[in-house]
Amino acid sequence: MVLLSILRILLLWGLVLFMEHRVQMTQVGQPSIAHLPEAPTLPLIQELLEEAPGKQQRKPRILGHPLRYMLELYQRSADASGHPRENRTIGATMVRLVRPLASVARPLRGSWHIQTLDFPLRPNRVAYQLVRATVVYRHQLHLTHSHLSCHVEPWVQKSPTNHFPSSGRGSSKPSLLPKAWTEMDIMEHVGQKLWNHKGRRVLRLRFVCQQPRGSEVREFWWHGTSSLDTVFLLLYFNDTQSVQKTKPLPKGLKEFTEKDPSLLLRRARQAGSIASEVPGPSREHDGPESNLCSLHPFQVSFQQLGWDHWIIAPHLYTPNYCKGVCPRVLHYGLNSPNHAIIQNLVNELVDQSVPQPSCVPYKYVPISILLIEANGSILYKEYEGMIAQSCTCR
């Protein structure tokens, strides 16, 4: 049974990876893996698979400040096992770091140096609401023999300068940035002009730098500065899907299930002799207490699963599993649904061909994952229902 549970977990994760690959490769115009079988569109599996690149795609070489920023964000928001911290302050369940496409630099014009940056925006997903958008950039560039003072502004054709509104500057969130960097809120600009548009969307910004008076910045020094490491976009999302919770048992049924088991079974057998002309043999006991339904720890590394080419953190995943025999009387502490309680009575009294309730996870906790998407973006995301925390019979 343990091996079967493990194989089920690995199969589900395999389906997750496959479906995510198909969605991502379709969006970037690459073919999917032809030799993999078709997979069912289970909601959680489909959601996770929408983030991962194909296995044949090597992890993009993402170094420098974007990766350092997201690693620090992850460490502040989750522990080493991936459990979200209770005191996390990012105010979102998903953060996507988007790097610009290849930039276009204008010819030098006196002391001004301008680069046009395009940030591709993925299609909207109904399940996620954009709650914050910021641009992070270096406001001081230290080049050989000189330095530049820089800022980011919205791109407007034939406009020398067009600053964001002063109210959008700065950030009220705790900063993860060194002193040479600035994070600026551009939610109003993104939300009004781009986010609700259909089709391909690109956020175009200008990275404008000015050299001090009396200094000279040679053109080859400027072109040696990579905008991929000096400017990036951060998009913050919240999951809008409601999590369905198990309803508590009615008061009468709760009292019914908490009565003395022997008395309850005697009454049940009496009812069974009326309900069934040929009742089957009853179970005399539930077995040793160690065999009862309970939570068992289980851990696997993403490297073992072959997913370390796109998952940055954590390195280990502890899904856990439930195993054991469900007792004859499902007491209230097991949090079993009404259907399972009735099913157990039917198995005991009426027809043993009706299976007993199974030992399955009841409560889950999320896991935070930092990963690289197919297009090279870095994603922090909290996935619900990934770690079993308690068990029930149903």
From Swiss-Prot:
Carbohydrate attachment residues: 87, 238, 375
Function: May be involved in follicular development. Seems to be an oocyte-specific growth/differentiation factor that stimulates folliculogenesis and granulosa cell (GC) growth.
PROSITE patterns (alphabetical): TGF_BETA_1, TGF_BETA_2
SUPFAM superfamilies in alphabetical order: Cystine-knot cytokines
Major place of residence: secreted
Source organism (scientific name): Bos taurus (Bovine)
Disulphide bonds in the chain: 293-359, 322-391, 326-393
Protein name: Bone morphogenetic protein 15
Residues that make up the propeptide removed upon maturation: 19-269
MF GO annotations: cytokine activity; growth factor activity
Gene3D superfamilies: Cystine-knot cytokines
InterPro entries associated with the record: Cystine-knot_cytokine, TGF-b_C, TGF-beta-rel, TGFb_CS
Subcellular location: Secreted
Family: Belongs to the TGF-beta family.
Signal peptide interval: 1-18
Assembly: Homodimer or heterodimer (Potential). But, in contrast to other members of this family, cannot be disulfide-linked.
Annotated GO CC locations: extracellular space
Keywords, ordered alphabetically: Cytokine, Disulfide bond, Glycoprotein, Growth factor, Secreted, Signal
Domain of life: Eukaryota
